[in-house]
Regions:
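Non-catalytic accessory segments of hydrolases
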Residues: 61-104, 110
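Alpha/beta-hydrolase superfamily serine-hydrolase fold, recognizing
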Residues: 6-28, 89-368
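N-terminal targeting or regulatory segments adjacent to alpha/beta-hydrolase or S9 domains
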Residues: 1-82, 363-368
Length: 368
């Protein structure tokens, strides 16, 4: 009996050490500050934002009537149909990107030689180019660019790395292909939200390491950067995040060690690996990057820690935060004044980051 207890204790100690030293990754508390550039600091949430929050409560209520085994299918269908694109002037062209389904999204002012790869969010399990057309159409407008929105492979049907490979394939392809066929790009960008923001940050590090043409600029909206679940706001902002809070409140009650082991098996990669947790990677030598996040959301500290670490490494990274906002509030930009404000900042950033790469040379004036 004594020998068995000693053996069991040894196993527990080994598992604990693996979890602490291998799965969690380095301590990132040194990068909790500064807090970033705050927008609309003293403004209360708009009436439009309060209406958005109320609508999210309706989603949670509807999901309670759906059998658990059908939750993912229901959420996928909801995302694809919840945000229809009302602007008939937007051009949508389906395209095959070296085996990855995708679509070109072009606003009337888009220059086909200016290209932006957009990587949609959805917790790596849902979402599509269709679900994010409101965002891709607006990115095309403010960037004066053709937007390539990819339908990357999702979990659980595919491993996490499959979606990562699709993003890499799309980047290589976009450098030499536009909406009108084979042609070189005059300017290239990448952007994504939430899980797509995670994939965006993973991609720009990979592009640097491969020596490929770097983006002129990148944008990440409320990105997830730490799959080891180390950010304080994951628990601290549960009650103030009306979108992610209700979905992940139950997970917050599970010990972090158990979630780390589950994540290791689910992703087939340790949670702190830089490919899926960009905050743990080398953040030097990155292109100009704008990160936007809400101070009320669960992922705000993922953004702060990533930006502060990248800035310390010498990369030109900017964090802009808004109070009160829901996760990826930019998706609601037709209704939300805060969403329109965020896109004004994005347009300004992309313009300033790509000066001299407009068709026909530099142009004066702001992007509308």
């Amino acid at each position: 009996m004594t020998e068995f207890l000693a053996w069991a204790l040894a196993v527990v100690v080994v598992l604990w050490l693996i979890q602490i030293l291998y799965l969690r990754g380095p301590d990132l508390r040194a990068f909790d500050g500064p807090i970033g550039q705050r927008r609309s600091i003293n403004a209360p949430p708009s009436a439009e934002h309060q209406a958005v929050v109320a609508s999210l409560g309706g989603i949670a209520g509807a999901l309670k009537n759906v059998p658990r085994r059908q939750h993912l299918a229901w959420l996928r269908n909801y995302m694809d149909n919840a945000f229809p694109l009302a602007d008939a002037a937007i051009r949508i062209d389906p395209v095959d990107v070296a085996g990855v389904p995708a679509e070109w999204v072009l606003a009337p002012n888009a220059d086909p030689r200016r290209r932006l790869l957009y990587i949609h969010g959805g917790a790596w399990t849902m979402g599509s180019p269709k679900s994010h057309r409101r965002l891709t159409a607006k990115f095309s407008e403010v960037a004066h660019a053709a937007v390539l929105a990819i339908d990357y492979r999702l979990m659980p049907e595919h491993p996490r790395l499959a979606g990562i490979e699709d993003c890499r394939t799309a980047w290589r392809w976009m450098l030499d292909h536009g909406p009108d066929g084979v042609s070189a790009a005059s300017a290239v960008f990448v952007a994504g939200d939430s899980a797509g923001g995670n994939l965006t940050l993973s991609l720009i590090a990979w592009v640097r390491d491969q020596g490929l043409r770097a983006p002129d600029a990148a944008v990440a909206l409320s990105p997830a950067t730490d799959a080891s679940l180390g950010s304080p706001s994951l628990k601290g902002n549960i009650e103030t995040d009306p979108m992610l809070g209700p979905l992940f409140k139950a997970l917050a009650k599970i010990p972090r060690a158990m979630l780390l082991w589950f994540g290791w098996f689910q992703n087939r990669m340790r949670p702190s690996h830089p490919v899926i947790s960009p905050v743990f990677g080398d953040l030097s030598g990155l292109p100009p990057l704008l990160v936007q996040a809400s101070e009320a959301e669960m992922l705000i500290d993922d953004s702060r820690r990533y930006v502060n670490k990248a800035s310390a490494a010498g990369s030109p990274v900017t964090l802009q935060t808004w109070p009160h906002m829901v996760h990826v509030w930019q998706l609601f930009h037709p209704e939300l004044p805060e969403g329109r404000e965020a896109f004004e900042e994005i347009g300004r950033f992309l313009r300033e980051s790509s000066q001299g790469r407009w068709a026909g040379g530099p142009r004066d004036g702001a992007i509308s």
